[in-house]
Amino acid sequence: MKREILVTSDGSTTIHLPDLDEQYHSKNGSINETYHVFINSGLKLVSAEKVSILEIGFGTGLNCFITYLEAKKVIDYVGVEAYPVTPEEVEKMNFIKVLKAEKERTIFEKMHAVSWEEKHQISETFSLLKRKQLFENIEDEDAFHLIYFDAFGARVQPELWSEEIFRKMFKALKENGILVTYSAKGSVRRAMLAVGFTVERLPGPPGKREMLRAIKKL
């Protein structure tokens, strides 16, 4: 499938799939979306001193890298990705420049260079395990404080936004765990509610009116 590098409205890059008319990050700003959806609406709400995070769709590593930049605590990060991006695509991402994070360049490069299926200590306070796995094969239980649900949109891959998948997400979270996603589709919200989540509609990132935050309240 054809893949192109696209510059989004905040100046940061994303990968565009023209055959699907879909992007890895919002055309209205890759970095803006990460901060709004995953950091400000997710990470900043977790009170634990050591935070376990599951990312559904590791992709370009942007959410992981910004989590590293913004975390004021110990992070245990698991990124799941069925189809990893290539080293050539990673090199074309301009996140370091736009974030003015030249001092952390080696961290971003290390996140992509480390092997899959093994836990690596990226820094003293940040560990990373990358799993090459289909989302429907996730079987974690009571393991995570926070899930970044960043799969391709329901228009393109509706099977990833089903009750079956969100039931797996519910099981994977600890009690009072949080799932955040850029999507606000009614069908997605209903699927979340059906498996037991408490769901909030929140103001969306640039270009989107709303987003969803789901909490596992027992």
Identify the function of each model-found stretch.
Residues M1-V51, L69-L99:
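Rossmann-like AdoMet
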Residues E55-G59, E81:
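Conserved S-adenosyl-L-methionine
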Residues G61-F65:
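Glycine-rich SAM-binding Motif I of class I
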Residues E91-E141:
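S-adenosyl-L-methionine
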Residues H145-E159:
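A short SAM/SAH-binding and catalytic strip from SAM-dependent methyltransferases
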Residues L146-Y148, E175-S183:
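Conserved beta-strand signature within the Rossmann-like core of class I S-adenosyl-L-methionine
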Residues L160-E175:
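A short glycine-rich, Lys/Arg-flanked "PGG" loop and its adjoining helix->strand segment in the class I
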Residues V195-L218:
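Core SAM-dependent methyltransferase catalytic element
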